[in-house]
Structure formats: structure tokens, C-alpha cells
């Protein structure tokens, strides 16, 4: 099975949902081979899904890389690294600890062509699609993903392509090609599936979140290089916080890949003194 997914929230405060955890369990049980996500929220990685079984086609907001190093050097952070980046401007302001080259985010904006091997993993996505007997689309509108012909085996006759199953509340451009289309919420459908398979309902536990073991610590001189809220470790310590003793106002609504332009025209309220 080859899985295409889309989550309902792209905020850095989000945590893996029931659907994310169910997908991870289905992969563990060898019922799902590969997951393709168009989101940049890193939630599939945080669910515990192995990186080699995941293609984040539009990047991951927690990953910055050094393309000057060979092979490309990757740094996973506990905060959104896209604070200073935008279309065609991907430098994060931090430097590689090995070669001092500028680190860049991994986000692929509309109109850009992603070239990074990871976390995009286009090769893994295309190879998985070629081997798939079923494609399950969960919560994705497919308005963007439909354009990627290699994901749908469009080079084959219709009868030779993987069977398509879609779960989404709204219409998708692939509905007419689906073997089954369920108009429902992903968590509800996945919950019923877990019951049908007699699997224990998986629950996200922050103590098991792999991002804490994968994360690259900031160097002392980099501590003030961002103002994003840091994902708190399970023990509550903010080891990598830009301002351990203070608070960052309205961080979820500032710039970055998901909030660009949100604050335009908004008036900032003055604090009472």
C-alpha cells in the first residue's frame, strides 16, 4: 500500500493525530509500505514513522540543511526554522558547524522545484508508487498531488494502476477514478479500521517523540538566532529555547512558511503598563 496524506493543521504547536499514529502502526504491521505527505509540519516523522518510509514532498519545517557539504548535512531542530525564509530565499541565518556554509530550509514553495534528496525523497515516493497495489489518500484535496504523474502510475493502462481509495470530507479531482470514496473524517475512519483489524488504538506520547533524539542542539552563539516557540521535551526543559526566561508573543501567527502575510494589516495591541 502506498499512502498519500494531508493533515488539518500546519502549526508548529500541532502534535501527531490519531490518524498519524494509526498510519505508523499500519506501517509497523507491514500493511503500509510508504507515506507521501504534502505538508511541512513534520508530524509523520514525529509519529515515529521511519524516514526511509516517508516522502515529505514540500519539505519539513523542523529541518535545515547545508548544501555546501557533501553529502548534504541535515540539522533537525525543535523549532520552526522558516522564520526568515520565503519564496526563493531559503537561508535561515545559521551556519553549518562543519564548513560554515549558510544553512537553508527545506520548504518547496509554490512555483519552486524541490531538488533536495531528503526530506523530499521523491525517489522513494516514485519507487513505492510503482510497487503499490493500493493507494490510500487520507484528508488530501489532491489539487496539488494530482499533478505529480509519477505518484499515480499514469504511464500504465487504467486497469494496471493501483486501486485508489480516498477519505476526505470534500470532493477531490480523483474521485471519479477511486474504487472507494468515503466522505468522512480521517480520525473517525481510522478508528473504525483499528477496531476492524483488532488493533489497540495508538496514542501519541511526547516521551516517545523521536524529534527529541534526532534534534541537533543549537550552539551557544545560535541561541538567539530565532524567536520561535520550542517544542518542550517531555521533562519540560527548554534546552534549545531562544529566550528560556521569557515568552514569545503570537509566535504561531508570525511569518514562516505557513503564516506568510497573515499579520498584514493586523494592528498590534499595546500592552497595558
Give the predicted meaning of each segment:
Residues 1-273:
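Conserved catalytic alpha/beta core of Sir2/sirtuin-type deacylases, generalized to analogous enzyme cores
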Amino acid at each position: 500500500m502506498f499512502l498519500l496524506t494531508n493533515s488539518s493543521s500546519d502549526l508548529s504547536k500541532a502534535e501527531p493525530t490519531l490518524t498519524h499514529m494509526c498510519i505508523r502502526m499500519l506501517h509497523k504491521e507491514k500493511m503500509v509500505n510508504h507515506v507521501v505527505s504534502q505538508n511541512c509540519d513534520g508530524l509523520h516523522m514525529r509519529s515515529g514513522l521511519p524516514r526511509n518510509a516517508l516522502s515529505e514532498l514540500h519539505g519539513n519545517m523542523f529541518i535545515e540543511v547545508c548544501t555546501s557539504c557533501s553529502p548534504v548535512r541535515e540539522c533537525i531542530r525543535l523549532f520552526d526554522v522558516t522564520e526568515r525564509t520565503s519564496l526563493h530565499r531559503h537561508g535561515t541565518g545559521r551556519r553549518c558547524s562543519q564548513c560554515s556554509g549558510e544553512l537553508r530550509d527545506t520548504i518547496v514553495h509554490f512555483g519552486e522545484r524541490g531538488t533536495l534528496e531528503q526530506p523530499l525523497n521523491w525517489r522513494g515516493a516514485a519507487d513505492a508508487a510503482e510497487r503499490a497495489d493500493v493507494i490510500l489518500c487520507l484528508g488530501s484535496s489532491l489539487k496539488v498531488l494530482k499533478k505529480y504523474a509519477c505518484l499515480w502510475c499514469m504511464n500504465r493502462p487504467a486497469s494496471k494502476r493501483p486501486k485508489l481509495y480516498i477519505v476526505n470530507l470534500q470532493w477531490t479531482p480523483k474521485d471519479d477514478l477511486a474504487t472507494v470514496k468515503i466522505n468522512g473524517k480521517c480520525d473517525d475512519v481510522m478508528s473504525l479500521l483499528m477496531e476492524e483489524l483488532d488493533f489497540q488504538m495508538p496514542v501519541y506520547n511526547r516521551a516517545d517523540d523521536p524529534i527529541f533524539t534526532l534534534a541537533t542542539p543549537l550552539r551557544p552563539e545560535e541561541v538567539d538566532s530565532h524567536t520561535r516557540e520550542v517544542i518542550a521535551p517531555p521533562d519540560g526543559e527548554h534546552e534549545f529555547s531562544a529566550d528560556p526566561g521569557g515568552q514569545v508573543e503570537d509566535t504561531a501567527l508570525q511569518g514562516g512558511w505557513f503564516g506568510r502575510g497573515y499579520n498584514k494589516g493586523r494592528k498590534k495591541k499595546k500592552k497595558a503598563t
